[in-house]
Amino acid sequence: KRQLYEGQFFPMTRGVSGALEMANTLRGSDFFYDFYEDPDALKELLKYCAHALVWYYDKQLEAAGQVFGGTITGFGEWLPGRAVGQLSEDTTTMISRAQFEEFGRPLTQKICTHYDSAFMHTHALSEHSLPAIASIPGIRAMELSSDPNTDRAVEVYKRNREALAGPVPVLRLTRGEIESNFELLKSQKTIVWYDASCMEDAQDMAALFAREFPVR
């Protein structure tokens, strides 16, 4: 590979979980009881997790370095400056918005504002908390993943479009979803991920985007 690319590489960071996810990993299922049985201790644990995550991600940035004055995140996006990404809020699928606002949001905001910008990873099952996440300062792009047993991410996004107006949305779409959402995609900045089945499919989709969304 080094010969193929003539020694030119774009290093990317791995990214980090949010403080809630790290605490969940440490506490296991008892984490969800902690909200009710020992909330003060949980808040102290979350502070520790946020501090540890910043320390860990700073080490990643130190190792990866900057690319054209920015950072390539764990999902391959380039963000300006010392950016954090991906930062994950998967645990919000299992807690209420009120719990996120009280326990998670302050620490997520602390992590985001430590850096110049952030790439956030979320899930459609977190629909109830998505507006609270999107309102955190510093989030430049927010991925919304689809989940089983709920509406597709693009439909969840459209329902909450006004409340999620801050970050650039990142949506993994099928060909059918792309073709049926031209109006949405033409009306705003959107990062589209598409899983091509082969090179021909990828080239065909690239041609479709060049035709329907010409660079001005």
Where are these regions (language model features)?
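Active-site loop segments of alpha/beta catalytic cores
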Residues: 1-216
